[in-house]
């Protein structure tokens, strides 16, 4: 539709795209369809003016995952689009993935016209109702005049407090309807009418108690989760840890929140965490939880998790406080704010500090590190997944890493050393198929950075169609497939807990030739089968311009250890036998 310059008569679709641009959205991910065509038609004009760019994925689930990773990589809100019916339902897994990991995304769905809602019209589903349990908030646009307010509220709600997913459902005729559009000259001057007002900041009394508990502790540990990453609190965490020499362990979501080359770093804790991190948590006298939620994959047997410790729990979401573990001190706040105030208070009273208060504790942890290091098996005739991932980590130290879910994800968490905001992985929901579209989102967010996708042969086949998106936009992404021809984690559990009854977990028969598959999309593919010259091969791969798929044929029966069996405590780990070749921090 043509508009006169300065005209106020606009369509709902115009208002929607205008508000996205006013909220500084530069890139969106989606897939068109009937009910959302008015929005796509409007988007066409805005793209011509280079005010916004849309990336066409090959499946709507990938649009949500790409928006999710874009949000993680930029600390902004990611946006995805899909049509009504199957387009909208295809977003559901991606929306749930983002919500479980507290990632701010806005999913915009088309809907049948208002007159047809409730009539079982073609491609009508109640996406508002379907997604209610897996979003932070939902909107249905019933009047185009509400679009400005709804979009502003969606951005506010998605980003403020504990971040999360927001759905905006837009009937087709709302996008087409013309009305007298009143935009906002400055979004900053527009205060959303929502009553959602999260409270930030600790009290002076809370900071003083935090300091007192910390200074009285002899065996403290920082237990850092995804909330610290979202808060971008790495500097403050490192300063606090260095100030009193406190060891630090992170969750899967918390990777990158602390310098992983720092000797105070213990790696990940929990089911596949390092032995020394789990031992340290089991023996600590003060557990400081920063943006972590005490989930089952971390705690093991909850009654025995840090059972001798006092707990300080800092989280922006009051619902997480006391949900699984009652703390002695609870602070509902952004982590960065709390740590800044704590550090300021501690620096004022340095004369009362015992500089050696944790020396014996650190010495004990150092012994655990030497006794139970992460192991890397080696055989010149074979290729082990730990070798591949460890070499990638050493060569690509500044890269963004997107992973899928399974054994390779746990090995990546163990061996990759990542920087703040550069770890992209589905942690809460554990969504297979996340890695490839996440790598796309990260590349769009950071076009000049190295993006590496580490996936498994089973996970990769969940969303391999996104090779088409990578080819279309010529995205320089390096895809390492850890190919053991199994659903590796399922096989490991079947071996350990189901008497080796491998029910439907073998993927060998019917597996495509991934190299030829990549070539069919116009993407170069290569295969690596042994550890011979592995370092030089990976160096060449990473330095080669353009997208590249690497099919790593690894030992088929390798298991991921350490491992905590269901119902066991974190001090009861499987697989702590010494290996021929080891690596320590």
Swiss-Prot record:
Cite the InterPro entries for this sequence.
Answer: Acetolactate_synth_lsu, AHAS_TPP, DHS-like_NAD/FAD-binding_dom, THDP-binding, Thiamin_PyroP_enz_cen_dom, Thiamin_PyroP_enz_TPP-bd_dom, TPP-bd_CS, TPP_enz
The pathway where this protein functions is: Amino-acid biosynthesis; L-isoleucine biosynthesis; L-isoleucine from 2-oxobutanoate: step 1/4; Amino-acid biosynthesis; L-valine biosynthesis; L-valine from pyruvate: step 1/4
Compartments it resides in: Plastid, Chloroplast
**Cofactor note, please?**
Binds 1 Mg(2+) ion per subunit. Binds 1 thiamine pyrophosphate per subunit.
Principal location listed in the UniProt entry: plastid
Cellular compartments per GO CC: acetolactate synthase complex; chloroplast
List of residues binding thiamine diphosphate: 60
Task: Using the UniProt record, name the top-level EC class of this enzyme in a single word.
Answer: transferase
Give its E.C. classification number: 2.2.1.6
Reaction catalysis annotation: 2 pyruvate + H(+) = (2S)-2-acetolactate + CO2
Q: What does the record give as cofactor?
A: Mg(2+); thiamine diphosphate
Keywords associated with the record: Amino-acid biosynthesis, Branched-chain amino acid biosynthesis, Chloroplast, FAD, Flavoprotein, Magnesium, Metal-binding, Plastid, Thiamine pyrophosphate, Transferase
Query: Which parts of the sequence are annotated with region: Thiamine pyrophosphate binding?
Result: 407-486
For binding FAD, which residues are annotated in this chain's numbering? 162, 272-293, 315-334
Under the subunit heading, UniProt states: Dimer of large and small chains.
State the similarity comment: Belongs to the TPP enzyme family.
Q: What is this protein called?
A: Acetolactate synthase large subunit
């Amino acid at each position: 539709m043509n508009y006169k310059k300065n005209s106020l008569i606009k369509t709902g679709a115009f208002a929607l795209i205008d508000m996205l641009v006013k909220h500084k959205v530069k890139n969106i991910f989606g897939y068109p369809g009937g009910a959302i065509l008015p929005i796509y038609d409007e988007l066409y004009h805005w793209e011509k003016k280079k005010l916004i760019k849309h990336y066409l994925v090959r499946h709507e689930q990938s649009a949500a995952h790409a928006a999710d990773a874009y949000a993680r990589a930029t600390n902004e809100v990611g946006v995805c689009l899909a049509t009504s019916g199957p387009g909208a339902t295809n977003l559901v897994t991606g929306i749930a993935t983002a919500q479980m990991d507290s990632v701010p995304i806005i999913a915009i769905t088309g809907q049948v016209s208002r007159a047809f809602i409730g009539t079982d019209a073609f491609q009508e589903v109640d996406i508002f109702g379907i997604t209610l349990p897996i979003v932070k908030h939902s909107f249905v646009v019933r009047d185009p005049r509400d679009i400005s307010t709804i979009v502003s509220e969606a951005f506010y709600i998605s980003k403020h407090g504990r971040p999360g997913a927001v759905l905006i459902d837009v009937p087709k005729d709302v996008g087409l309807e013309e009305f007298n559009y009143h935009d906002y000259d400055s979004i900053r001057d527009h205060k959303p009418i929502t009553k959602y007002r999260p409270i930030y900041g600790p009290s002076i009394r809370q900071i003083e108690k935090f300091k007192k508990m910390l200074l009285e502790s002899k065996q403290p540990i920082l237990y850092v989760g995804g909330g610290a990453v979202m808060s971008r609190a790495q500097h403050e965490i490192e300063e606090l840890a260095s100030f009193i020499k406190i060891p630090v362990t992170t969750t899967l979501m918390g990777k990158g929140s602390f310098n992983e080359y720092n000797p105070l770093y213990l790696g990940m804790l929990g089911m596949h965490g390092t032995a020394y991190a789990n031992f340290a948590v089991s023996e600590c006298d003060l557990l400081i939880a920063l943006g972590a939620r005490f989930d089952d994959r971390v705690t093991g047997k909850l009654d025995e998790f840090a059972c001798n410790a006092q707990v300080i729990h800092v989280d922006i979401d009051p619902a997480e406080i006391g949900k699984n573990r009652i703390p002695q001190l609870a602070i509902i706040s952004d982590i960065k704010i709390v740590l800044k105030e704590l550090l300021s208070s501690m620096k004022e009273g340095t004369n009362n500090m015992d500089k050696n208060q944790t020396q014996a504790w650190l010495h004990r942890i150092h012994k655990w590190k030497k006794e139970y290091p992460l192991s890397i098996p080696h055989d010149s005739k074979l290729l082990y997944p730990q070798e591949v991932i460890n070499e990638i980590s050493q060569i690509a130290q500044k890269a963004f890493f997107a992973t899928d879910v399974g054994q390779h994800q746990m090995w990546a968490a163990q061996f990759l050393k990542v920087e703040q905001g550069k770890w992209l992985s589905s942690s809460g929901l554990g969504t297979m198929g996340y890695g490839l579209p996440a790598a796309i989102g990260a590349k769009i967010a950071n076009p000049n950075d190295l993006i590496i996708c580490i996936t498994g042969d089973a996970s990769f086949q969940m969303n391999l169609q996104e090779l088409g998106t990578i080819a279309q936009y010529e995205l320089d992404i390096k895809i390492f497939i850890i190919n053991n021809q199994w659903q590796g984690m399922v096989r490991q559990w079947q071996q350990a807990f189901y008497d080796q009854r491998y029910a439907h977990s073998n993927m060998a028969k019917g597996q495509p030739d991934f190299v030829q598959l990549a070539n069919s999309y116009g993407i170069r593919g290569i295969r690596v089968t042994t550890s011979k010259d592995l370092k030089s091969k990976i160096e060449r791969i990473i330095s080669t311009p353009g997208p590249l798929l690497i099919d790593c044929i690894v030992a088929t029966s390798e298991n991921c250890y350490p491992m905590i069996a269901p119902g066991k405590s974190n001090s009861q780990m499987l697989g702590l036998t010494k290996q021929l070749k080891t690596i320590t921090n």
